[in-house]
Amino acid sequence: MKKLIAYWFVFIVLSFSVSAQFIDRANKVSPSIDYAKLAYIDTLINNYLRNEWETGIVTIIVKDNQLVQYKGYGYLNAATRKPMPPDAMFRIMSQTKAITGVGIMILYEQGKLLLDEPVGDFIPEFRNQVVLDKFNAADTTYTTVPAKRTITIRDLLTHSSGIDYADIGSAAMKAIYAKAGIPSGLGYFDRDLKTEMKKLGKLPLGFQPGEKFQYGLNTDLLGCLIEIISAQTLDAFLRENIFEPLGMKDTYFNVPEPKANRLATVYTENDEHHIIPWSHSFRNIDPDYPTMKKHYFSGGAGLTSTAFDYAIFMQMLLNGGIYNGKRILSPRTVEIMTSNQLDFHFNGTDDFGLGFEIVSDKAANLGPKNKGSFSWGGYYGTTYWADPKAKMVCLIMTQHTPNSHGDLASKITDIIYSSLRK
């Protein structure tokens, strides 16, 4: 009888543990939150909207698996004055990277790749690479030296491979990439992903592998590796292995037409710092790219999603790779992803894991986030983080860049942490 009671006790505890792994959307008051202090977020955001420093924002806060805040502010479209709904869809740009990184780690757990395996094992064009030595800006000619070693999958995940971006990197690499027709990875391209990545493999690296951090097309290349190894498109692989198991119903490379009316309008600023709608002439990015049928699936910047969908993804990682009973990764793999992988602070203060910025000891003393918090964001003004110590996931979503009042997310972050009772 005692054994039977013990078994039932274990069963109940395990059942509760599994059920507690999803985000509880019930309207409950969290004892961990000082709601009077949290309300300063409303005051702050409304001030930014009133001064026309922002047009529309969505915030979401999940604490102890409980939905604490999920709000839309301002407008989905400022011209039509359509209110911003909490389930608005955002071009999340570089927030795509973490999802692609998890895709790679799924293949890693299946034994289909090693983190320190050469990229050239899968794409021959990345064998025998060279590194840029001297560059002549007058005619874009250059000299090279041999790479000391081949680039690896770990190098791609940590942006330490020497691969650059085609439109935001160094002047030399931008010129070399432009001459070769390498895409930026942002927006829409009527091209083949594998073809473009093979072209990239024939070009020089910007520095010796592992020596520096340089944001670049690394995650587009990881997406290409997923397609080669899995024999699926990146879209199909992520949908089958991440989106559908987690119930991420609003995350797409190609947004379905019936959901297009939930897309937030993208804004930029004119020379007087007044907000204006984004035009496709800016950086050659058509703002309608989420609805444009594409087959170049950018693992670095191609997804559109909602704050709640992305919160589910982050909660899965915070739970150690499981959400609502669906295991995506093992706890140890998540631990590896969210542990420092570089011998240097990539931005002077923070560590960098396999796809995430990680708050270091040094950074934890400079701001509210606890050591070990992992985060990143997207070009159009979206940002996210998960704080394991606080058991919290937060997202702040806008569609506005460049932004002369880009300190809003930092101020919201300060308010969130000041509202924590424990």
Tell what function each PLM region has.
Residues 21-30, 180-184:
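Short, contiguous pre-domain boundary segments
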Residues 53, 83-84, 114, 144-151, ...:
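Extracellular/periplasmic catalytic domains that process cell-envelope and extracellular macromolecules
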Residues 55-57, 68, 380-383, 392:
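Short loop/turn microsegments at loop-to-beta-strand junctions
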Residues 1-24:
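Bacterial Sec-dependent N-terminal signal peptides
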Residues 127-371:
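Short, surface-exposed loop or secondary-structure junction motifs
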